[in-house]
Amino acid sequence: MAKHDSHLRCSFCNKSQDQVRKLIAGPGVYICDECVELCNEILEEELYDGNTPPATAPAASRRETPRKSSRSLPSLAQLPKPREIMRYLDQYVIGQEKAKKVLSVAVYNHYKRLAAKANPNSLGAAELDEVELQKSNILVIGPTGSGKTLLAETLARMLDVPFAVADATTLTEAGYVGEDVENILLRLLQVADMDVEEAQRGIIYIDEIDKIARKSENPSITRDVSGEGVQQALLKMLEGTIANVPPQGGRKHPYQDCIQIDTSNILFICGGAFVGLEKVIEQRIGKKSMGFIKPGEQLAVTREQRLADALKALEPEDLIKYGMIPEFIGRLPVVATLDPLDEKALEAILTQPKNAILKQAQKLLRMDGVELEFEPAAISAIAKEAYRRKTGARALRAIVEELMLDVMYEVPSRRDIKYVRITAEMVERRSTHELIPHPSTLPKPESA
């Protein structure tokens, strides 16, 4: 038997087991340690191409060595100023002037802080060299459909940084059914093509943050795993920490190597509608509705104005009474409140932004060689119906999509249609089957 073992050879290089350090046996084949090393070198050259640390390096060093970023951090002189950020936001977001100003200043200061860390000698004043600039995360409060997510998306697009959106309602404490808070960082990492350095200067928008308010003002003896427990889990991430992020999600693959991400340079924007917050504010300031209100439209305007006035008097203690823990509110020092959208604002949203819904519909039809026109009365009718639905700007797209269904269906197949006009009557009937062809395309009457 020993004689037979001495003639075992590598199936690739044909060296005997006496000529190599290790011979690995498989089902009918053998491979030596030298061939394994050669295969490893080939894989490194072809697959990694120098962007990832070698597989032979320790796991810790592979996690901590980020891929070289394709986009460098702009210098202080290259950063867009708050006025420039505001002008850019004006192109996509209608109204909300106070919120846009607050966000412009907060975002500028955040990335100015990153530029100062990258270029510490650019400050000039020696007495300020030891001053540490701390991060200021942002809390955005406003009714549904008022533009909270749109503001965050537009800021990220202007600054050309990775941007990820997370839903707070799916988060739970570690060990319970649901998503871990580290999955938020995983989304940002995926948007940055797994580039750690790039992800560490990105923006994360956490939506529905009001849904993780604790169920009662007083701490409970039972665990609140999707409310206060999530707030506690988010504290260190918001403040800045080295987080271990599982690249495939932590629950289904518990034994994978984690990627380390420093969250101290990531800007967190938390948004929520905070339904009922105005009642908490009014209770604090002792304001009560008195007298009689006529039914109908005046009631809606009064409720809208009541919400806007209440948010102007917002204090941190109101958010704490609502169910947010003090430590969580303390890590969101910048607060921007958005006003409810009235009919006039909804009309402007339909037509003024660069990506306005009506402009998108006109462009789609123009690709089929058809001009689309909305009468002013039709635009007002769409805004009025959207306001009635009480879902903010989101209702506009739903109404326009429903209204344009017949047009989008008929136009590509009909060469006689070169012009379509949408009237207020069509909006009220939710139907556009009466297509209006351009006079030049109508058949000419036969001469006698």
Swiss-Prot record:
Family membership: Belongs to the ClpX chaperone family.
Domain ClpX-type ZB: 1-51
Binding residue positions for ATP: 143-150
Region of interest: Disordered: 50-76
UniProt-annotated binding residues for Zn(2+): 10, 13, 32, 35
Gene3D superfamilies: 1.10.8.60, ClpX chaperone, C4-type zinc finger domain, P-loop containing nucleotide triphosphate hydrolases
Family annotation (SMART domains): AAA, ClpB_D2-small, zf-C4_ClpX
Protein's name according to its UniProt entry: ATP-dependent Clp protease ATP-binding subunit ClpX
Subunit-structure text: Component of the ClpX-ClpP complex. Forms a hexameric ring that, in the presence of ATP, binds to fourteen ClpP subunits assembled into a disk-like structure with a central cavity, resembling the structure of eukaryotic proteasomes.
Keyword NADP: no
GO biological process, one term: proteolysis involved in protein catabolic process
Keywords associated with the record: ATP-binding, Chaperone, Metal-binding, Nucleotide-binding, Zinc
